[in-house]
Protein backbone atom coordinates (compact mmCIF):
# COMPACT_ATOMS: atom_id res chain seq x y z
CA UNK A 1 0.00 0.00 0.00
CA UNK A 2 1.23 3.47 -0.88
CA UNK A 3 0.88 6.71 1.03
CA UNK A 4 2.04 10.32 1.16
CA UNK A 5 2.94 12.88 3.81
CA UNK A 6 0.82 16.03 3.80
CA UNK A 7 2.56 17.44 6.89
CA UNK A 8 5.64 19.67 6.91
CA UNK A 9 7.79 17.10 8.72
CA UNK A 10 6.91 13.64 10.04
CA UNK A 11 9.24 11.71 12.38
CA UNK A 12 10.20 8.19 11.31
CA UNK A 13 11.04 6.16 14.42
CA UNK A 14 13.04 3.03 15.18
CA UNK A 15 10.13 1.48 17.08
CA UNK A 16 6.35 1.86 17.20
CA UNK A 17 6.18 4.31 20.10
CA UNK A 18 6.36 8.08 20.53
CA UNK A 19 9.47 7.96 22.72
CA UNK A 20 11.46 5.82 20.29
CA UNK A 21 14.59 7.07 18.55
CA UNK A 22 14.00 9.20 15.46
CA UNK A 23 15.88 7.62 12.54
CA UNK A 24 14.90 10.16 9.89
CA UNK A 25 12.05 12.43 8.82
CA UNK A 26 9.53 12.46 6.01
CA UNK A 27 8.95 15.82 4.31
CA UNK A 28 5.76 17.18 2.79
CA UNK A 29 4.96 15.37 -0.45
CA UNK A 30 7.28 12.41 0.13
CA UNK A 31 5.81 8.98 -0.48
CA UNK A 32 6.26 5.64 1.23
CA UNK A 33 5.32 1.97 1.02
CA UNK A 34 3.65 0.32 4.02
CA UNK A 35 5.50 -2.82 5.13
CA UNK A 36 3.54 -3.59 8.29
CA UNK A 37 0.48 -2.18 10.05
CA UNK A 38 -0.41 -1.90 13.72
CA UNK A 39 -3.47 -0.14 15.23
CA UNK A 40 -1.64 3.20 15.64
CA UNK A 41 1.55 2.68 13.69
CA UNK A 42 2.76 1.80 10.21
CA UNK A 43 6.19 0.39 9.44
CA UNK A 44 7.17 2.02 6.18
CA UNK A 45 9.89 2.28 3.57
CA UNK A 46 10.56 5.74 2.13
CA UNK A 47 10.54 5.79 -1.65
CA UNK A 48 13.21 8.48 -2.04
CA UNK A 49 16.06 6.86 -0.08
CA UNK A 50 14.86 3.45 1.09
CA UNK A 51 14.91 4.25 4.82
CA UNK A 52 12.61 2.13 6.97
CA UNK A 53 10.92 2.91 10.25
CA UNK A 54 7.66 3.47 12.10
CA UNK A 55 5.30 6.38 11.48
CA UNK A 56 2.17 7.42 13.37
CA UNK A 57 -0.62 6.12 11.12
CA UNK A 58 -2.70 9.30 11.41
CA UNK A 59 0.12 11.36 9.89
CA UNK A 60 -0.07 9.68 6.49
CA UNK A 61 -2.59 9.92 3.68
CA UNK A 62 -3.28 6.79 1.61
CA UNK A 63 -2.86 6.79 -2.17
CA UNK A 64 -4.42 4.59 -4.81
CA UNK A 65 -2.06 2.92 -7.27
CA UNK A 66 -3.34 5.27 -9.97
CA UNK A 67 -2.68 8.34 -7.80
CA UNK A 68 0.77 7.04 -6.88
CA UNK A 69 1.78 6.36 -10.49
CA UNK A 70 0.64 9.80 -11.66
CA UNK A 71 2.19 11.58 -8.68
CA UNK A 72 5.52 9.77 -9.01
CA UNK A 73 5.90 10.98 -12.59
CA UNK A 74 5.25 14.58 -11.55
CA UNK A 75 7.49 14.25 -8.47
CA UNK A 76 10.53 13.19 -10.49
CA UNK A 77 10.71 16.57 -12.25
CA UNK A 78 9.14 18.72 -9.53
CA UNK A 79 10.30 22.16 -8.42
CA UNK A 80 11.95 22.39 -5.02
CA UNK A 81 12.01 24.69 -1.98
CA UNK A 82 15.56 26.08 -1.87
CA UNK A 83 15.47 28.15 1.35
CA UNK A 84 15.41 26.70 4.88
CA UNK A 85 11.72 27.48 5.34
CA UNK A 86 8.85 29.07 3.44
CA UNK A 87 5.08 29.16 3.99
CA UNK A 88 2.67 27.84 1.39
CA UNK A 89 -1.01 28.81 1.39
CA UNK A 90 -3.80 26.43 0.43
CA UNK A 91 -6.12 28.05 -2.10
CA UNK A 92 -8.94 25.83 -0.83
CA UNK A 93 -9.10 27.14 2.74
CA UNK A 94 -6.35 29.82 2.96
CA UNK A 95 -4.53 27.87 5.68
CA UNK A 96 -0.74 28.00 5.70
CA UNK A 97 1.79 25.20 5.98
CA UNK A 98 5.54 25.65 6.56
CA UNK A 99 7.70 23.84 4.01
CA UNK A 100 11.41 23.22 4.42
CA UNK A 101 14.32 23.04 1.99
CA UNK A 102 14.31 20.02 -0.27
CA UNK A 103 10.51 19.77 -0.32
CA UNK A 104 9.38 19.01 -3.86
CA UNK A 105 6.47 20.91 -5.39
CA UNK A 106 4.56 19.02 -8.07
CA UNK A 107 2.81 20.76 -10.96
CA UNK A 108 4.59 24.01 -10.10
CA UNK A 109 4.23 27.15 -12.20
CA UNK A 110 4.71 30.83 -11.33
CA UNK A 111 4.35 30.56 -7.56
CA UNK A 112 1.64 27.93 -7.58
CA UNK A 113 1.74 24.16 -7.18
CA UNK A 114 -0.75 21.35 -6.75
CA UNK A 115 -0.63 18.14 -4.77
CA UNK A 116 -3.38 15.52 -5.08
CA UNK A 117 -5.72 18.10 -6.53
CA UNK A 118 -5.15 20.73 -3.83
CA UNK A 119 -3.71 24.04 -5.16
CA UNK A 120 -1.20 26.08 -3.13
CA UNK A 121 0.50 29.48 -3.45
CA UNK A 122 4.14 30.00 -2.49
CA UNK A 123 6.83 32.71 -2.74
CA UNK A 124 8.41 31.99 -6.12
CA UNK A 125 11.73 33.54 -5.06
CA UNK A 126 12.25 30.62 -2.66
CA UNK A 127 11.68 27.91 -5.26
CA UNK A 128 13.98 26.44 -7.91
CA UNK A 129 12.62 24.72 -11.00
CA UNK A 130 15.98 23.27 -12.07
CA UNK A 131 18.97 22.03 -10.05
CA UNK A 132 21.53 24.69 -9.16
CA UNK A 133 24.89 24.45 -10.93
CA UNK A 134 27.39 23.12 -8.41
CA UNK A 135 30.37 25.45 -7.98
CA UNK A 136 31.96 27.28 -5.06
CA UNK A 137 30.05 30.53 -5.53
CA UNK A 138 26.65 28.86 -5.78
CA UNK A 139 27.42 26.52 -2.90
CA UNK A 140 28.33 29.42 -0.60
CA UNK A 141 25.30 31.41 -1.74
CA UNK A 142 23.03 28.46 -0.93
CA UNK A 143 24.44 27.20 2.37
CA UNK A 144 24.79 30.62 4.04
CA UNK A 145 21.07 30.52 4.82
CA UNK A 146 21.53 27.20 6.64
CA UNK A 147 24.28 28.32 9.01
CA UNK A 148 23.52 27.78 12.72
CA UNK A 149 20.67 25.32 12.16
CA UNK A 150 20.98 23.12 15.28
CA UNK A 151 21.98 19.47 15.23
CA UNK A 152 19.10 17.01 15.67
CA UNK A 153 19.52 13.25 15.40
CA UNK A 154 17.44 12.03 12.46
CA UNK A 155 16.55 15.58 11.42
CA UNK A 156 16.54 16.97 7.91
CA UNK A 157 14.65 20.26 8.21
CA UNK A 158 15.33 23.88 9.08
CA UNK A 159 14.65 23.43 12.81
CA UNK A 160 17.17 20.61 13.20
CA UNK A 161 19.39 18.41 11.05
CA UNK A 162 21.94 15.69 11.56
CA UNK A 163 25.13 15.59 9.49
CA UNK A 164 23.81 13.34 6.72
CA UNK A 165 20.38 14.97 6.70
CA UNK A 166 22.14 18.26 6.00
CA UNK A 167 24.19 16.82 3.12
CA UNK A 168 21.19 15.00 1.68
CA UNK A 169 19.05 18.14 1.58
CA UNK A 170 21.76 20.52 0.35
CA UNK A 171 22.99 18.19 -2.38
CA UNK A 172 19.42 17.61 -3.58
CA UNK A 173 19.28 21.31 -4.49
CA UNK A 174 22.20 20.66 -6.83
CA UNK A 175 20.51 17.67 -8.43
CA UNK A 176 22.37 15.01 -6.43
CA UNK A 177 20.34 12.21 -4.88
CA UNK A 178 22.01 10.84 -1.74
CA UNK A 179 21.16 7.97 0.56
CA UNK A 180 20.22 8.90 4.12
CA UNK A 181 23.08 7.96 6.44
CA UNK A 182 26.73 9.01 6.26
CA UNK A 183 27.95 5.40 6.01
CA UNK A 184 25.55 4.83 3.10
CA UNK A 185 26.46 8.07 1.35
CA UNK A 186 30.13 7.02 1.45
CA UNK A 187 29.39 3.97 -0.73
CA UNK A 188 28.35 5.95 -3.81
CA UNK A 189 30.49 7.83 -6.31
CA UNK A 190 34.20 7.95 -7.12
CA UNK A 191 36.77 8.58 -4.40
CA UNK A 192 39.35 11.37 -4.64
CA UNK A 193 42.97 10.28 -4.21
CA UNK A 194 43.76 12.98 -1.66
CA UNK A 195 42.62 16.32 -0.30
CA UNK A 196 44.59 18.36 -2.84
CA UNK A 197 42.09 17.24 -5.50
CA UNK A 198 39.03 18.47 -3.60
CA UNK A 199 36.50 20.67 -5.40
CA UNK A 200 33.49 22.58 -4.11
CA UNK A 201 30.60 20.21 -3.42
CA UNK A 202 32.65 17.08 -2.82
CA UNK A 203 31.44 14.95 0.07
CA UNK A 204 33.99 14.56 2.85
CA UNK A 205 33.65 11.59 5.21
CA UNK A 206 35.08 11.03 8.66
CA UNK A 207 35.54 7.85 10.67
CA UNK A 208 36.25 9.07 14.15
CA UNK A 209 35.06 11.80 16.48
CA UNK A 210 37.64 12.92 19.01
CA UNK A 211 41.17 11.92 18.08
CA UNK A 212 42.19 11.27 21.69
CA UNK A 213 40.01 8.18 22.08
CA UNK A 214 42.29 5.80 20.21
CA UNK A 215 42.82 4.77 16.62
CA UNK A 216 40.07 5.50 14.14
CA UNK A 217 38.18 2.58 12.67
CA UNK A 218 38.54 3.02 8.89
CA UNK A 219 35.50 0.83 8.28
CA UNK A 220 33.13 2.97 10.36
CA UNK A 221 32.02 6.24 8.79
CA UNK A 222 30.46 8.41 11.47
CA UNK A 223 30.27 11.89 9.94
CA UNK A 224 29.95 13.71 6.62
CA UNK A 225 30.27 17.28 5.39
CA UNK A 226 30.46 19.21 2.12
CA UNK A 227 33.78 20.65 0.96
CA UNK A 228 33.83 24.33 0.03
CA UNK A 229 37.41 23.95 -1.17
CA UNK A 230 40.46 21.97 -0.02
CA UNK A 231 40.72 23.98 3.22
CA UNK A 232 37.09 24.45 4.34
CA UNK A 233 34.13 22.19 5.01
CA UNK A 234 30.54 22.97 5.95
CA UNK A 235 28.91 20.38 8.17
CA UNK A 236 26.43 19.91 11.00
CA UNK A 237 28.03 19.10 14.34
CA UNK A 238 26.25 20.89 17.16
CA UNK A 239 25.09 23.30 14.49
CA UNK A 240 25.69 23.93 10.80
CA UNK A 241 29.04 25.69 10.50
CA UNK A 242 32.13 26.18 8.34
CA UNK A 243 35.41 24.85 9.73
CA UNK A 244 39.00 24.27 8.69
CA UNK A 245 39.70 21.11 6.70
CA UNK A 246 43.06 19.46 6.07
CA UNK A 247 44.53 16.01 5.47
CA UNK A 248 44.02 15.08 9.14
CA UNK A 249 40.39 16.11 9.38
CA UNK A 250 38.29 18.96 10.75
CA UNK A 251 40.10 21.42 12.99
CA UNK A 252 37.84 23.05 15.58
CA UNK A 253 39.19 26.49 16.48
CA UNK A 254 36.95 26.79 19.56
CA UNK A 255 38.31 23.55 21.03
CA UNK A 256 41.82 24.06 19.73
CA UNK A 257 42.05 20.61 18.18
CA UNK A 258 40.73 18.15 15.64
CA UNK A 259 37.15 17.00 16.11
CA UNK A 260 36.83 14.55 13.19
CA UNK A 261 39.34 12.29 11.43
CA UNK A 262 39.33 12.36 7.62
CA UNK A 263 38.37 9.01 6.06
CA UNK A 264 37.50 9.59 2.41
CA UNK A 265 36.40 12.13 -0.19
CA UNK A 266 33.82 11.52 -2.92
CA UNK A 267 33.91 13.47 -6.17
CA UNK A 268 30.55 15.27 -6.43
CA UNK A 269 30.65 15.07 -10.22
CA UNK A 270 30.41 11.28 -9.95
CA UNK A 271 27.17 11.47 -7.95
CA UNK A 272 23.80 11.20 -9.69
Regions found by a protein language model. Name each.
Residues 1-7, 17, 24, 30-31, ...:
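Boundary regions of SH3-family modules and the immediately adjacent low-complexity/disordered segments
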Residues 61-62, 128-129, 192, 218-223, ...:
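Aromatic- and glycine-rich peptidoglycan recognition patches
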Amino acid sequence: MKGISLYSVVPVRAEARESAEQNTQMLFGETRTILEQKPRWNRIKLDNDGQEGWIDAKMLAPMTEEEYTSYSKAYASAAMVSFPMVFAVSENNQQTIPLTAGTRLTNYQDGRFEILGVPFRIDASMVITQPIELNEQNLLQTVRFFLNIPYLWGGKNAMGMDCSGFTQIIMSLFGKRLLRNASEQATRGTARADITQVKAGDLVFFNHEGLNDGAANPQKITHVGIAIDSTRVIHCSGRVKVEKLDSTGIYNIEQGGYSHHLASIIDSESLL
